[in-house]
């Protein structure tokens, strides 16, 4: 049965980065079967696409305040993977992540409704984002969940999945995203995500009573992700305070 921390992690990551793009190989494929999924198989690929590239660009930019996302590079999902839709000047990269950015055990791994706007800073764009971009290529080429997991395990064994660089973080402040069927309205809370080499959650006080930070550390991956809710969405409107 899914724990409250697992639910919180799924709402926040999508992410994934669920966070598999963000935290590759969170769990084995058999764990996905332990939770009865409403999405046991991938939907037709068209259901994962956004009809208008302009709409996808706007949704991606909504992940962070305009002062950050406006001059950021934007990637949108094409036929075979993500493609550059807008060049950037500040080192940030904004995308709309799909459901396969979640952990392998996530019951919503194939949820075609998920749209998770994220803006990565330069460090995470170099060291965290590429794992998700590669996974997307596998999905669009028709890979199954088991094949994706096997390839990820092989990449980990070959040390092709790097540790996050120092200072790696991203913004998830969009009011318009859909992170999970379980999240209220689909978009949970505006939050920042910090990626560090695998470490104990207690080093940040994550998950302790009253602590405004949560964390997730996969069993196989080299990444620990910390989530810090903030008080406003990217458009400046206030968010409902989170109960600690």
Residue spans for each PLM region:
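A general, composition-driven signal for non-globular sequence regions
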Residues: 1-4, 55
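Primary mode marks residue(s) on the alpha4-beta5-alpha5 output face of response regulator receiver
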Residues: 33-244
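Bacterial N-terminal signal peptides that target proteins for export
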Residues: 3-16
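Sec/Tat signal peptide C-region and signal peptidase I cleavage site
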Residues: 26-33
